[in-house]
Every structure is written in C-alpha cells, then in structure tokens.
Amino acid sequence: MTEVETIIKTVLKTGGYRLGSKSTLKSLRNGEAKAVIVASNCPEEVLEKIKSYDVKILVYNGTNMELGALCGKPFSVAAMAITEEI
C-alpha cells in the first residue's frame, strides 16, 4: 500500500475529507482543505484550479474510477480534499 493510499484509508475512517472536484474546490476557497489528493487522470482544468491554491497536492497513481472505488463509491472521484491535518 502506498503512502497516498494509507492517507486515504485513514481519512475515510475519521471523516476529514470532501469528495469530488466541486467539493474540493469549495473546501479550498473556504480555507478548509489542508491537502488535496488527485487521481492520475484528473482533468487538467481542475488540476490548474487546485494548483492556484497554496496547498499540498498528492497524486494517487490510479484513475478517477479506481480512486472512487478505493473510497467505497460507485462513481469516479477526480479529486478529494483532506480537511484535517495528516
């Protein structure tokens, strides 16, 4: 298991996260996001918006479908915000 996968598993247990590009960007605008995890195939326009914030960005080596599955969701997840210290 990679470091990013370990972080994902931890925040899924504690609830300190927001799933999806829109929720992630909202968390960034509100100053709630401490870090962001993006799928390897995250859309470029979303990634550029995330990069405009001063936040740590971690890249999950799987696709958005794989990230969604890892999060226990039946849909793709291109980005997720971590809202607690990691």
From Swiss-Prot:
The record's InterPro entries line, in alphabetical order, gives: Ribosomal_eL30, Ribosomal_eL30-like, Ribosomal_eL30-like_sf, Ribosomal_eL30_CS, Ribosomal_eL8/eL30/eS12/Gad45
- UniProt superkingdom: Archaea
One GO BP: translation
> What protein name does the entry list?
Large ribosomal subunit protein eL30
Q: Does the keyword Ribonucleoprotein apply?
A: yes
Q: Which organism's genome codes for this protein?
A: Archaeoglobus fulgidus (strain ATCC 49558 / DSM 4304 / JCM 9628 / NBRC 100126 / VC-16)
Q: What keywords are assigned to this protein?
A: Ribonucleoprotein, Ribosomal protein
Task: Name the protein family.
Answer: Belongs to the eukaryotic ribosomal protein eL30 family.
Mind telling me which GO cellular component terms the entry cites?
A: cytosolic large ribosomal subunit
Highest lineage ranks of the organism?
A: Archaea, Methanobacteriati, Methanobacteriota, Archaeoglobi, Archaeoglobales
Q: Its Gene Ontology molecular function terms?
A: RNA binding; structural constituent of ribosome
Pfam families reported for this sequence: Ribosomal_L7Ae
